[in-house]
Amino acid sequence: MSKSINLALVGASGVVGSKIISIFEKKNIAINNFYPLGSSSVGNHVIFNDHKYQIEELATFDSSLADIAIFSAGSNVAKEYAESFVNNGTYVIDLSSEFRYEDDVPLVIPEINGNILSELNGPTLIANPNCSVSQLLVAIEPIHRNFKVDILNIATYQAVSGTGKEAVEELTNQIKHDKSDVNVYPKQIAFNVIPQCDIFLENDFTKEEMKVAWELSIIHI
């Protein structure tokens, strides 16, 4: 029988946090104590396995209560709090890009290099790769293993949900109404494709494009 865990979820009320909750429910992963954490959403509630949980304040939470903490609240939050969780004995899985390029932080896709997890010496930070990289490598790795891939020409189409709830709401409003305010993106996003994801860098590539290049060089297949 697998051990039940005490889980903290930072950003529990966000788009990604909500999806994480639904995956844990679907996979029927044994959770002993669940701690939804946030800042602006403190006092709100989330439903997990038919139980109602009140979101607690991240800044004052006793992180030693959690065996594992998943950070899904962006780079700034991860930068401020993630390492303190590790120092208190918690394994931290960070979904942002904050720690992906640190030499001492493993960048893990379980299907590709999950063996790294068995080699960890106690609580540590674990970085989650860019979503495009994860999907790409899961598909490409078995092909590369058997036939060797030399060149990749990659095109990705990013979901509006990746920008957050405000972007989803803006898309919904634009679909429902002929005219709607454009606040999140530089142009109307409904029925449109904008050839830019994240900021442009000095080399004229966007940061999102460079994340793919950087992370492919870190995760060896």
Q: Predicted regions span which residues?
A:
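Long, contiguous binding/interaction regions
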Residues: T172-N173, D178-K179, N183, Q188-F191, ...
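Conserved small/polar residues in nucleotide/adenosyl-binding loops
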Residues: I219-I221
